A protein has these predicted regions:
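N-terminal module of bacterial RNA polymerase sigma factors
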Residues: 1-27
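Amphipathic alpha-helical segment used for protein-protein interaction
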Residues: 8, 12-15, 98-112
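Arg/Lys-rich amphipathic alpha helix in sigma70-family domain 2
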Residues: 59-62, 73-92
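Amphipathic, non-transmembrane alpha-helical scaffold segments
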Residues: 18, 22-26, 72, 108-112
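Structural recognition of an alpha-helix C-terminal capping motif at a helix-to-coil junction
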Residues: 31, 45-52, 56, 65-77
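Short, charged helix-capping/linker segments at alpha-helix termini
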Residues: 11-19, 30-49
């Protein structure tokens, strides 16, 4: 069954067909998330989040191109939201701050 027909039927009440759509694109979306994150566990979570959003908004989807592109857009937004919400704060050093002599000794010990 073509994506357009699947989506039409899902939008008109046949929610069981969501499983077919998810199975069809799951690996592609997982690979995309893994490409963006480099983390298998996180990619799994982001893939799940992508499909949860699809389930929530499938009723508003209008067929205007490849469905896979639509899913990739959702996945990209999910990944970007994750990165925005989980920024790592980096401590900036003042121009006058330098590393301590002890830091250098610690580095030498680690290298040996």
């Amino acid at each position: 069954m073509e994506d357009k027909e699947l989506i039409y039927k899902i939008q008109h009440g046949n929610k069981e067909l969501l499983e077919i759509l998810i199975e069809k694109y799951y690996d592609d979306i997982y690979r995309f998330c893994y490409y963006k994150t480099g983390n298998s566990s996180l990619s799994y979570d982001l893939t799940q989040e992508t499909f949860l959003k699809l389930i929530k908004y499938i009723g508003t989807y209008k067929h205007r191109g490849k469905f896979k592109s639509y899913l990739i857009t959702i996945a990209m937004n999910v990944c970007n939201t994750y990165f925005d919400e989980n920024k790592v704060e980096l401590e900036e050093l003042d121009d006058n701050q330098t590393y301590k002599e002890n830091d250098s000794n610690e580095l030498s010990r680690i290298e040996q």
